[in-house]
């Protein structure tokens, strides 16, 4: 990733950080539709490009990395349901995603190992996630942002179930989730009180977590070399784990993780 690429992406990523910081508790609604209207105005003259969206770009090929049971891209129905959930979670008085195009700026593509590593380092360079409290809302904002700005289909961001450190299940994504104790810090951890006008993510994060832990994003460059999620918790990959079905199901049951 050269200097010119960094300059082009610098401002959009700064916008991502601002939106993540503005994300707060509660639901959201009609802003997504407003974004769509804004995007339609901005894409005049480029309809041909948008109508020919493809899944070109780098794809992971099975066998490129050993013991990497990648998830297949989400089925169209699942992707539509996911996007509907995103729309349901955007409130008319919430501007967290204002300025994000409603349609991707570039052709759609699936996440790849190289792309995940590159995006992880770029986000770290711009200070986008380090130490930021995790929440389901911020998770969705990151998904939507990377899909609209980078064309990355939002079916890749998953973490191990915990408790404890949550490792990314997509090999190449270098951001893990680390539990922190917020009993003493409360809202002082992120000091912009105007930005956080409702419940602070430090207080709501644990409600998103099945173990009641408060999590923050933390960069770990070693995740590019070692597939921690698969090494530590192969049962979470189900049939792709290589384990006998009875064994991985028993392990999931013992940890209280639902499976189908």
UniProtKB/Swiss-Prot annotation:
One of its GO terms (cellular component) is host cell plasma membrane. Its main location: host cell. It is found in: Host cell membrane. It comes from Human immunodeficiency virus type 2 subtype A (isolate CAM2). InterPro entries: HIV-1_Nef_core_sf, HIV_Nef. A motif (PxxP) lies at residues 104-107. Residues 39-59 are annotated as: Disordered. This is Protein Nef. Belongs to the lentivirus primate group Nef protein family. Factor of infectivity and pathogenicity, required for optimal virus replication. Alters numerous pathways of T-lymphocyte function and down-regulates immunity surface molecules in order to evade host defense and increase viral infectivity. Alters the functionality of other immunity cells, like dendritic cells, monocytes/macrophages and NK cells. One of the earliest and most abundantly expressed viral proteins. A lipid is attached at residue 2 (N-myristoyl glycine). It holds the Pfam family F-protein. The N-terminal domain is composed of the N-myristoyl glycine and of a cluster of positively charged amino acids. It is required for inner plasma membrane targeting of Nef and virion incorporation, and thereby for infectivity. The gene is nef. It is a lipid-anchor. One of its GO terms (molecular function) is GTP binding. Residues 140-156 are annotated as: Mediates dimerization. Keywords: AIDS, Host cell membrane, Host membrane, Host-virus interaction, Lipoprotein, Membrane, Myristate, Viral immunoevasion, Virulence.
